[in-house]
Amino acid sequence: MTMEKNGGNSSRGGQVGGKSVCVYCGSSFGAKALYSESAEELGALFHKLGWKLVYGGGTTGLMGKIARSTMGPDLSGQVHGIIPNALVSKERTDEDKEDVNKALLESVENHKGATPISEEYGETTIVPDMHTRKRMMANLSDAFVAMPGGYGTFEEIMECITWSQLGIHNKPIILFNIDGFYDKLLEFLKHSIQERFISVKNGEIIQVASTPQEVVDKIEKYVVPEGRFNLNWSDEGHAHEDCAK
């Protein structure tokens, strides 16, 4: 995966002065209505601020909820979903499973087909695999937010955390801890710090928010923690250079 390093005020396709925020979340709604309500509120806040949502391209669960909310009732918001071809039939339930969208399917090879499938979900790009999906999502984003989700959400945000620790990027990483969803994970991370597998300073890579406004505030006020690995990735060719910008 490649990422861009600077998590400042630049935008990867959002409005001038706005941000592009990558949100990882579940393709289901979960057990509590509060998860869906919070996704809707966060999307509405992005819409109000003129921030762009970058997400996994699904129309179901929390993914679909935050995408529709970010677009807004007037469809003037900014959303870019990236989804692997194999997941279209599972996470794009608004589409005909036998004939998704010819223009989009052509983008599997050239990655230039950011053509809307449905206006209420903004732009969608179909890619050939998960690695390409994660790379594109990261490169398009100024910050990362994890809402409640499953294995995929955990893996995606943990990779972002690891790459920050390694000095590959400086972008804000926020756990949106709705109704204490991430409490046990945070306890485990604290345990790892106590057992000296994670340094205290590297524990500061992750910021925690409990409301949509706090998510935005944490992104805007994020300070890159000291104590991360000062590694030189220039010998890795192009594998990390986009992430280091």
UniProtKB/Swiss-Prot annotation:
GO BP terms in the entry: cytokinin biosynthetic process; response to purine-containing compound
InterPro entries: LOG, LOG_fam
Cellular component terms (Gene Ontology): cytoplasm; cytosol; nucleus
MF GO annotations: cytokinin riboside 5'-monophosphate phosphoribohydrolase activity
Domain of life per record: Eukaryota
Coiled coil, from the record: none
Residues annotated as transmembrane: none
Family matches, as SUPFAM superfamilies: MCP/YpsA-like (SSF102405)
PANTHER family for this protein: LOG FAMILY PROTEIN YJL055W
Note: Present with 6440 molecules/cell in log phase SD medium.
Entry similarity comment: Belongs to the LOG family.
Identification of the protein by name: LOG family protein YJL055W
Organism this protein belongs to: Saccharomyces cerevisiae (strain ATCC 204508 / S288c) (Baker's yeast)
